[in-house]
A protein has these predicted regions:
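Active-site diphosphate/adenylate-binding microenvironment
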Residues: 1-59, 64
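Conserved thiamine diphosphate
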Residues: 67-103
């Protein structure tokens, strides 16, 4: 049974702490998430300017985590966006950058 976006967003709303930072790629899922999730603090939502940049979210999430190591970071993206930046996974491992990635 596939996971429905509304279920994913509800789960994220229930478990994410108020200081969580969320990064997003382009795409329908991420557009829906901008309305469905809570952003409690300034600088909590990181998106490409016009939601037209695929592959932004994962690398952005790594940067956010480096800038704010104590904040939980969740990166939302589709399979295409992750495929475009999967090479950054080795960067995250090599430097111990721990984020949550939802593809």
């Amino acid at each position: 049974m596939p996971l429905q976006p509304s279920g994913l967003f509800k789960t994220l709303r229930d478990v994410l702490p108020r200081d969580a930072a969320i990064t997003m790629d382009a795409g329908t899922l991420c557009l829906q998430a901008t309305d469905a999730l809570n952003y409690w603090q300034p600088k909590s939502l990181f998106t490409p300017l016009d939601f037209g940049l695929v592959g932004f979210s994962f690398a952005c999430g790594l940067g956010v985590k480096l800038a704010a190591p104590d904040r939980p970071v969740v990166s939302l993206m589709g399979d295409g966006g992750f495929g475009m930046t999967v090479s950054e996974l080795s960067t995250a491992v090599d430097h111990g950058i721990n984020t949550v990635t939802v593809v």
